[in-house]
């Protein structure tokens, strides 16, 4: 039986837009939770997983906005993989993700949270083919920051917000 999970989606049927629509957890959600708990020794709650995924999406979006500017500076009308500000740390996390992605089993979850940020330029095929790896690398980067910056096995909401601030400063 799938559990209900609140992703903060506002129901269009309600006139009161402060009401939140509850939806089923996306596939891969439980696998991410299991992997973080058993392999990374990080115990996340539904709330902290939601904060984690929102932070990953925010970092992904920030990468794209900077890449759009670099593409313009380079005289291109599309964003290429080379335009992304892939730091050495993120590159290492992407490589680690590629080694363990089968063990994590989060492909469906990454597809669910993957999105093209609202940029004005087209996205090159080389970059589109790397979405999953970049998102997976960002997940592992967040896990690394959780362990090193907070030292908490079960991070609180405040700890997750702190982690999001640290990752945000990287990009």
From Swiss-Prot:
Superkingdom of origin organism: Bacteria
Coiled-coil residue spans: none
Disulfide bonds: none
GO molecular function, one term: protein heterodimerization activity
Family, similarity comment: To A.aeolicus aq_616.
UniProt-recorded name of the protein: Uncharacterized protein aq_328
Organism classification: Bacteria, Pseudomonadati, Aquificota, Aquificia, Aquificales
């Amino acid at each position: 039986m799938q559990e209900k999970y609140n992703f903060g989606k506002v129901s269009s049927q309600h006139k009161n837009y402060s009401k939140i629509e509850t939806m089923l957890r996306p596939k891969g959600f439980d696998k991410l939770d299991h992997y973080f708990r058993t392999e990374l020794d990080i115990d996340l709650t539904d709330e902290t997983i939601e904060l984690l995924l929102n932070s990953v999406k925010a970092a992904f979006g920030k990468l794209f906005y900077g890449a759009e500017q670099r593409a313009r500076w380079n005289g291109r009308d599309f964003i290429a993989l080379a335009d992304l500000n892939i730091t050495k740390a993120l590159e290492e996390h992407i490589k680690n993700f590629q080694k363990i992605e089968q063990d994590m089993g989060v492909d469906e979850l990454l597809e669910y949270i993957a999105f093209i940020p609202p940029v004005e330029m087209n996205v090159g095929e080389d970059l589109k083919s790397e979405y999953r790896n970049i998102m997976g690398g960002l997940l592992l980067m967040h896990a690394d920051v959780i362990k090193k910056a907070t030292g908490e096995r079960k991070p609180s909401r405040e700890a997750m917000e702190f982690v999001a601030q640290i990752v945000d400063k990287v990009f």
